[in-house]
């Protein structure tokens, strides 16, 4: 578990890449926090619960159900305790779960496709943001295992951080499939979903794409075309 603070650098002048990743062309928007960092260097935010605090987040990285996960949450007291029975005031008790896009079954561990450092808007409002590579569609196409991983992550959050008011799921393309499939496989696991570039599932989407390819080929190579070449259209 590490602490990071949001610098006062304006958007577009700093990199939203993970601060513990490879060097970026611009300075990182998020920097490691220590008690020696001056408050003037840290952005201040007000959560949707009306709590105003410096924008400092606690980031937990671990493994769950074979996937690598990241959890980031706003802290109101960087050096103070946090228990499930006494969560810090920076968290609004809401969870924002991001599902990664694409589709695949590589059968290997990898870090989540979505970086917590890009979800500043949610962190500013007090949401706990979470990702797990086993809930990224590019890393795992077993939808039952994916839903099981979401359940295990929620259990870990409740045990470690405190009771959850509600959980929002979000994602694009394969991420939208996982959001929708959660609602089908385990109703109630997600209290709401916000999807973009949405598909219902991988099976019906694949059939539609395959049909389109075959039909386009057929229309361009119809055997009846020569018979109709000199026929006037009605």
Where is each model-derived feature located?
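Catalytic-loop region of hydrolases
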Residues: 1-91
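Short, surface-exposed "cap/lid" segments of acyl-processing enzymes
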Residues: 70-118
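Active-site machinery of serine-nucleophile hydrolases
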Residues: 93-102, 112-135, 146-150
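Solvent-exposed loop/turn segments at secondary-structure junctions
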Residues: 101-106, 129, 135-139, 173-177, ...
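Alpha/beta-hydrolase active-site loop
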Residues: 141-161
């Amino acid at each position: 578990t590490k602490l990071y603070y949001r610098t006062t650098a304006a958007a577009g002048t700093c990199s939203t890449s993970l601060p513990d990743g490879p060097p970026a062309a611009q300075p990182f928007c998020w920097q490691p926090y220590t008690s020696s960092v001056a408050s003037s260097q840290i952005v201040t935010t007000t959560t949707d619960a009306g709590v105003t605090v410096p924008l400092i987040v606690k980031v937990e990285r671990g493994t769950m159900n074979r996937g690598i996960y990241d959890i980031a949450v706003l802290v109101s007291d960087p050096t103070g305790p946090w228990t499930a029975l006494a969560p810090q005031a920076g968290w609004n008790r809401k969870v924002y779960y991001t599902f990664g896009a694409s589709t695949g079954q590589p059968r290997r561990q990898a870090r989540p496709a979505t970086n917590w450092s890009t979800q500043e808007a949610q962190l500013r409002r007090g949401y706990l943001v979470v990702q797990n590579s086993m809930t990224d569609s590019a890393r795992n196409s077993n939808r039952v295992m994916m839903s099981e991983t979401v359940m295990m992550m929620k259990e870990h959050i409740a045990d470690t951080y405190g009771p959850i008011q509600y959980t929002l799921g979000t994602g694009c393309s394969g991420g939208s499939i996982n959001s929708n499939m959660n609602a089908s496989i385990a109703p109630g696991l997600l209290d709401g979903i916000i999807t973009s570039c949405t598909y219902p599932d991988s099976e019906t989407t694949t059939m539609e794409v395959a049909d389109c390819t075959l039909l386009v080929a057929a229309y361009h190579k119809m055997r009846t075309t020569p018979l109709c070449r000199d026929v006037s259209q009605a």
